[in-house]
Amino acid sequence: MAKLQVSLKARALRYLSAREHSRQELARKLARYAQEGDDIEALLDTLEAANFMSEARFSESLVNRRAARFGNSRILSELKSHNIDPDSLTEIKAALAQDEVARAREVWTRKFGVAASDANGRAKQMRFLLQRGFSHRAIQAAMRAKEENED
């Protein structure tokens, strides 16, 4: 039995029905299946015009998926890697900055729960949060607040 050839548009819609994709990400995924004469850019333009694909929805989706586990710099870095508009990045950065300390505290609590008793332990906890993309200011505020709660 012959395998059915799925059109690029059908493939794109299948990808987009699972989750939001950036233009760059969807183009990369579709490029594997493109045949000679297929115009991926025109297809992506059509999908954007029909509002099947949206940079704003993708950005919002990515932020919602990542915010509970990662800090601002990691999220913004990932958005930049998807070629998101710099103006949108500025708005997202401002929105993320409002609750970074609370998110850092929550991630720290899930991972460690109690403040370290020595300098090496504190450094380990701070490195963990730094690797997750939280700022020094947010890390210090989160750890300071946790230590005050324990006293």
From Swiss-Prot:
It is found in: Cytoplasm. The keyword tRNA-binding does not apply. InterPro entries: RecX_HTH_1st, RecX_HTH_3rd, Regulatory_RecX, WH-like_DNA-bd_sf. Its main location: cytoplasm. One of its GO terms (biological process) is regulation of DNA repair. One of its GO terms (cellular component) is cytoplasm. Keywords: Cytoplasm. Coiled coil: none annotated. Modulates RecA activity. PANTHER family: REGULATORY PROTEIN RECX FAMILY PROTEIN (PTHR33602:SF1). Belongs to the RecX family. HAMAP family: RecX. This is Regulatory protein RecX. It comes from Herminiimonas arsenicoxydans. The lineage of its organism: Bacteria, Pseudomonadati, Pseudomonadota, Betaproteobacteria, Burkholderiales.
